[in-house]
Amino acid sequence: MTETANLFFLGAAGGVEWGTVIVQVLTFIVLLALLKKFAWGPLKDVMDKRERDINRDIDDAEQAKLNAQKLEEENKQKLKETQEEVQKILEDAKVQARQQQEQIIHEANVRANGMIETAQSEINSQKERAIADINNQVSELSVLIASKVLRKEISEQDQKALVDKYLKEAGDK
């Protein structure tokens, strides 16, 4: 069995043809050199270019992610500022509405007080006129009664003086 293995390794003729082995080794080396120059070099260049493209795409993606995060932060800040501004506008509107309400109530009170004062002065003036009318009627009635009592007629001027005198005496009591 060892002999069969030796025949297999040594070749069928039983000897190694070193010329063929050297030619095959040289052919293999030339083939490797040609592959390196014409296949491995361009293939390596393509792989290097692809690696650079992938790295550039990764860098671009990271930059885009950073830009997106920055934009998101800016949008959050703008949203916060907008919400604060809306809140301030609402608060200002509430304050202004309260002020307008107070002003309207104040103006209504001023008008109501003015109307009350006008009504009171009108009432007082009508009261004074009514009192004056009553005084005139009382004086006329007093003169009439006095003239009937005395059964004599006195002048109108004397009657008024007499009534005024009685009214003054009645007012003093």
Swiss-Prot record:
F(1)F(0) ATP synthase produces ATP from ADP in the presence of a proton or sodium gradient. F-type ATPases consist of two structural domains, F(1) containing the extramembraneous catalytic core and F(0) containing the membrane proton channel, linked together by a central stalk and a peripheral stalk. During catalysis, ATP synthesis in the catalytic domain of F(1) is coupled via a rotary mechanism of the central stalk subunits to proton translocation. F-type ATPases have 2 components, F(1) - the catalytic core - and F(0) - the membrane proton channel. F(1) has five subunits: alpha(3), beta(3), gamma(1), delta(1), epsilon(1). F(0) has three main subunits: a(1), b(2) and c(10-14). The alpha and beta chains form an alternating ring which encloses part of the gamma chain. F(1) is attached to F(0) by a central stalk formed by the gamma and epsilon chains, while a peripheral stalk is formed by the delta and b chains. PANTHER family: ATP SYNTHASE SUBUNIT B, ATP SYNTHASE SUBUNIT B', CHLOROPLASTIC. Keywords: ATP synthesis, Cell membrane, CF(0), Hydrogen ion transport, Ion transport, Membrane, Transmembrane, Transmembrane helix, Transport. It comes from Staphylococcus aureus (strain MRSA252). Its main location: membrane. Disulfide bonds: none annotated. CDD domains: ATP-synt_Fo_b (cd06503). GO terms for molecular function: proton-transporting ATP synthase activity, rotational mechanism; proton-transporting ATPase activity, rotational mechanism. Pfam families: ATP-synt_B (PF00430). This is ATP synthase subunit b. One of its GO terms (cellular component) is proton-transporting ATP synthase complex. It is a single-pass membrane protein. The chain crosses the membrane at residues 15-35. Belongs to the ATPase B chain family. It is found in: Cell membrane.
